[in-house]
């Protein structure tokens, strides 16, 4: 029996329930570890993450709480894009979606191709490449980068400028995908909420670097105002880091859906989710089991 000593936990009854359930949860977590290498160390970190979450499960400003996923009632998750790096999880609901915006292209456009196959026009931007890997009549690419402030450069524009150029200032029900290697923090810090409301889905690969915790909190609180996280995935090309007392992946893929006209229930999936989650790097160990810290909600409430 695993014994945890945790002080200052107000709800003793819930903690007793946690102690009784934790051993079984550890066994389940153990099965999710894809490699026996450093297994004890990995499991120890997972337990530390659980304990930290337990301390903070009522703290709305903790990173774990700001990233808490929920399930969407009546909607099924599907994978869009490749079964490796470049694919993301959305829902099987594309009704009335005509346009998508994709920032950060490089040479991986399987996500964009799958959306194009659904008759969605993709407005694609990346100032670091010379051309797309292949042509599609639904692709609308420009060698332009995304910036948070107007800077009068020919190859850098704000989100608002791009929406105006494309005639989408009043468009709703769009899809947004952003993977711009750390630039996402300033973009989301400065973007108007009215622009975010134009997007039904928002999928982002967030890169945790040297920014202070307050900027992370600001961005996630802003996104959580009108959108709900329904899926998380760790990019295993990078590693696990610890900041503000918690473990998190340095590159974390997050899928949001707009709250309006949707209902949500408690999240009950274990990561990685079969047939949805795939390793970004097939040669490296999967690290998505760290996200199962959210199973504490189910332990505490049962």
Regions found by a protein language model. Give the residues of each.
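Boundary detector for helix-to-coil junctions that initiate low-complexity/charged tails
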Residues: 1-43
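Rossmann-like AdoMet/SAM-dependent catalytic core
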Residues: 25-94, 108, 154-172, 208-302
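SAM cofactor-binding core of SAM-dependent methyltransferases
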Residues: 75-153, 208
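Structural motif
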Residues: 98-99, 175, 201
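Residues that flank catalytic or metal-binding motifs in active/ligand-binding sites
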Residues: 137, 198, 250-252
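Switch II (G3) loop of P-loop NTPases
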Residues: 180-183
